[in-house]
Regions:
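Core AdoMet radical
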Residues: 1-60, 69-72, 98-103
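Mobile, glycine- and charge-enriched loop segments
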Residues: 1-2, 9-12, 57-76, 128-144, ...
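Alpha-helix N-cap and loop-to-helix initiation/capping positions
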Residues: 48-55, 80-87, 115-123
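Residue-level marker for beta-strand->alpha-helix junctions and adjacent short loops that shape enzyme
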Residues: 17, 40-42, 77, 107, ...
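Alpha-helical scaffolding segments of alpha/beta enzyme cores, especially the outer helices
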Residues: 3, 20-27, 55-65, 87-94, ...
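Short, flexible active-site loops
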Residues: 68-77, 85, 106-116
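Active-site glycine- and acidic-residue-rich loops that bind
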Residues: 13-18, 52, 75-90
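Auxiliary Fe-S-binding modules of radical SAM enzymes
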Residues: 90-191
Length: 191
Protein backbone atom coordinates (compact mmCIF):
# COMPACT_ATOMS: atom_id res chain seq x y z
CA UNK A 1 0.00 0.00 0.00
CA UNK A 2 2.84 2.41 0.81
CA UNK A 3 4.21 2.04 -2.70
CA UNK A 4 0.87 3.03 -4.23
CA UNK A 5 0.18 5.96 -1.90
CA UNK A 6 3.40 7.91 -1.44
CA UNK A 7 1.66 10.75 0.41
CA UNK A 8 0.03 8.47 3.00
CA UNK A 9 1.70 8.73 6.40
CA UNK A 10 1.59 5.42 8.26
CA UNK A 11 1.43 5.14 12.06
CA UNK A 12 1.89 1.91 14.01
CA UNK A 13 0.80 1.09 17.56
CA UNK A 14 2.33 -2.20 18.73
CA UNK A 15 3.08 -1.56 22.41
CA UNK A 16 6.51 -2.00 23.98
CA UNK A 17 9.10 -2.39 21.21
CA UNK A 18 12.83 -2.80 20.89
CA UNK A 19 14.87 -0.54 18.66
CA UNK A 20 15.31 -3.48 16.26
CA UNK A 21 11.56 -4.09 15.98
CA UNK A 22 10.93 -0.39 15.45
CA UNK A 23 13.59 -0.30 12.74
CA UNK A 24 11.76 -3.11 10.91
CA UNK A 25 8.56 -1.05 11.07
CA UNK A 26 10.41 2.01 9.76
CA UNK A 27 11.89 -0.07 6.93
CA UNK A 28 8.34 -1.16 6.05
CA UNK A 29 7.29 2.48 5.62
CA UNK A 30 6.02 3.49 9.06
CA UNK A 31 6.76 7.15 9.77
CA UNK A 32 5.10 7.52 13.19
CA UNK A 33 4.89 5.26 16.25
CA UNK A 34 1.99 5.61 18.70
CA UNK A 35 2.75 4.73 22.32
CA UNK A 36 0.91 6.52 25.13
CA UNK A 37 2.51 7.20 28.50
CA UNK A 38 -1.11 7.00 29.82
CA UNK A 39 -0.50 9.15 32.94
CA UNK A 40 2.28 10.52 35.13
CA UNK A 41 5.17 8.44 36.43
CA UNK A 42 3.80 8.89 39.98
CA UNK A 43 0.28 7.66 39.15
CA UNK A 44 1.29 4.99 36.63
CA UNK A 45 1.37 2.03 39.12
CA UNK A 46 -2.36 2.66 39.69
CA UNK A 47 -3.01 2.19 35.98
CA UNK A 48 -0.70 -0.62 34.82
CA UNK A 49 1.20 -3.41 36.55
CA UNK A 50 2.34 -5.52 33.57
CA UNK A 51 5.21 -3.18 32.66
CA UNK A 52 6.81 -0.02 33.96
CA UNK A 53 6.63 3.64 33.05
CA UNK A 54 10.29 3.38 32.07
CA UNK A 55 9.42 0.57 29.62
CA UNK A 56 7.08 3.00 27.90
CA UNK A 57 9.60 5.86 27.98
CA UNK A 58 12.30 3.60 26.54
CA UNK A 59 10.04 2.56 23.64
CA UNK A 60 9.48 6.24 22.83
CA UNK A 61 13.22 6.94 23.05
CA UNK A 62 13.93 3.97 20.77
CA UNK A 63 11.42 5.23 18.20
CA UNK A 64 12.91 8.73 18.25
CA UNK A 65 16.47 7.32 18.04
CA UNK A 66 15.76 5.66 14.70
CA UNK A 67 14.04 8.73 13.30
CA UNK A 68 10.36 7.92 13.77
CA UNK A 69 7.89 10.61 14.75
CA UNK A 70 6.08 9.75 17.98
CA UNK A 71 2.45 10.13 19.00
CA UNK A 72 2.10 9.78 22.78
CA UNK A 73 -0.37 11.07 25.31
CA UNK A 74 -2.63 9.73 27.98
CA UNK A 75 -6.10 9.31 29.38
CA UNK A 76 -7.66 11.94 31.63
CA UNK A 77 -10.08 10.69 34.28
CA UNK A 78 -8.20 7.66 35.61
CA UNK A 79 -8.12 9.23 39.08
CA UNK A 80 -5.04 11.35 38.48
CA UNK A 81 -4.60 14.90 39.73
CA UNK A 82 -3.98 18.02 37.65
CA UNK A 83 -0.38 17.77 38.89
CA UNK A 84 -0.17 14.29 37.34
CA UNK A 85 -1.40 15.68 34.02
CA UNK A 86 1.15 18.48 34.15
CA UNK A 87 3.96 16.06 35.04
CA UNK A 88 3.02 13.91 32.05
CA UNK A 89 3.05 17.00 29.81
CA UNK A 90 6.59 17.84 30.87
CA UNK A 91 7.67 14.21 30.29
CA UNK A 92 6.15 14.33 26.79
CA UNK A 93 7.91 17.63 26.11
CA UNK A 94 11.25 16.20 27.28
CA UNK A 95 10.73 13.18 25.01
CA UNK A 96 10.09 15.57 22.10
CA UNK A 97 6.95 13.76 20.95
CA UNK A 98 5.38 15.12 17.78
CA UNK A 99 1.75 14.53 18.63
CA UNK A 100 -0.21 14.23 21.89
CA UNK A 101 -3.60 12.48 21.77
CA UNK A 102 -5.97 13.84 24.42
CA UNK A 103 -8.14 10.94 25.60
CA UNK A 104 -10.94 11.35 28.15
CA UNK A 105 -11.96 8.25 30.08
CA UNK A 106 -15.28 6.71 29.20
CA UNK A 107 -15.91 4.33 32.11
CA UNK A 108 -16.77 0.85 30.83
CA UNK A 109 -18.68 -1.57 33.11
CA UNK A 110 -16.52 -4.44 34.31
CA UNK A 111 -13.25 -2.49 34.13
CA UNK A 112 -11.19 -1.21 37.09
CA UNK A 113 -12.20 2.37 36.25
CA UNK A 114 -15.95 1.77 35.81
CA UNK A 115 -16.88 3.89 38.84
CA UNK A 116 -14.53 6.80 38.19
CA UNK A 117 -16.13 10.22 38.41
CA UNK A 118 -16.13 12.07 35.10
CA UNK A 119 -13.67 14.92 34.75
CA UNK A 120 -15.55 18.19 34.31
CA UNK A 121 -15.36 19.67 30.80
CA UNK A 122 -13.81 22.92 32.07
CA UNK A 123 -11.09 20.88 33.80
CA UNK A 124 -10.29 19.20 30.48
CA UNK A 125 -10.21 22.56 28.69
CA UNK A 126 -7.88 23.92 31.37
CA UNK A 127 -5.62 20.89 30.88
CA UNK A 128 -5.60 21.39 27.09
CA UNK A 129 -4.61 25.04 27.60
CA UNK A 130 -1.80 24.04 29.96
CA UNK A 131 -0.57 21.43 27.46
CA UNK A 132 -0.56 24.04 24.69
CA UNK A 133 1.48 26.38 26.91
CA UNK A 134 3.99 23.61 27.77
CA UNK A 135 4.19 22.25 24.21
CA UNK A 136 3.48 25.21 21.88
CA UNK A 137 4.57 23.45 18.66
CA UNK A 138 3.29 19.93 19.32
CA UNK A 139 0.12 18.61 17.69
CA UNK A 140 -2.54 18.26 20.39
CA UNK A 141 -5.11 15.79 19.06
CA UNK A 142 -8.63 15.18 20.21
CA UNK A 143 -8.92 11.42 20.62
CA UNK A 144 -11.19 9.03 22.54
CA UNK A 145 -13.86 10.39 24.85
CA UNK A 146 -14.00 13.93 23.50
CA UNK A 147 -17.78 13.61 23.20
CA UNK A 148 -17.72 13.90 27.02
CA UNK A 149 -17.04 17.60 26.48
CA UNK A 150 -20.51 18.07 24.99
CA UNK A 151 -20.99 21.65 23.82
CA UNK A 152 -17.45 22.51 24.95
CA UNK A 153 -15.81 20.39 22.24
CA UNK A 154 -15.48 23.41 19.93
CA UNK A 155 -13.92 25.44 22.74
CA UNK A 156 -11.10 22.90 22.87
CA UNK A 157 -10.01 24.08 19.42
CA UNK A 158 -9.65 27.58 20.83
CA UNK A 159 -7.75 26.26 23.88
CA UNK A 160 -5.07 24.48 21.89
CA UNK A 161 -6.37 21.42 20.05
CA UNK A 162 -5.11 21.56 16.46
CA UNK A 163 -5.86 18.07 15.16
CA UNK A 164 -8.25 15.20 15.81
CA UNK A 165 -8.66 11.48 15.41
CA UNK A 166 -12.05 10.88 13.87
CA UNK A 167 -14.30 7.85 13.67
CA UNK A 168 -14.81 5.16 16.29
CA UNK A 169 -12.24 3.97 18.83
CA UNK A 170 -11.35 0.63 20.39
CA UNK A 171 -14.22 0.50 22.89
CA UNK A 172 -16.24 3.65 22.27
CA UNK A 173 -17.92 5.49 19.44
CA UNK A 174 -16.49 8.70 18.11
CA UNK A 175 -17.67 11.15 15.49
CA UNK A 176 -17.76 11.29 11.72
CA UNK A 177 -15.35 13.07 9.41
CA UNK A 178 -18.22 15.27 8.19
CA UNK A 179 -19.12 16.38 11.73
CA UNK A 180 -15.46 17.18 12.44
CA UNK A 181 -15.14 19.16 9.21
CA UNK A 182 -18.28 21.13 10.06
CA UNK A 183 -17.02 21.85 13.58
CA UNK A 184 -13.73 23.21 12.24
CA UNK A 185 -15.27 25.34 9.50
CA UNK A 186 -17.99 26.71 11.84
CA UNK A 187 -15.17 28.20 13.90
CA UNK A 188 -13.72 29.86 10.82
CA UNK A 189 -10.76 27.54 10.33
CA UNK A 190 -9.78 26.07 6.98
CA UNK A 191 -9.10 22.40 6.36
Amino acid sequence: MRERTKKLSLCASHGICTKEALQKLANAGISMYHHNLETSRRFYPNVCTSHTYDDRVNTIKNAKAIGLNVCSGGIFGLGETIEDRIDMAFDLKELKVNSVPINILTPIPGTPFENNKAVEPLEILKTISIYRFIMPKTHLRYAGGRIKLGNYVKTGLKCGINSALTGNFLTTTGTTIEKDKNMVTELGYKI
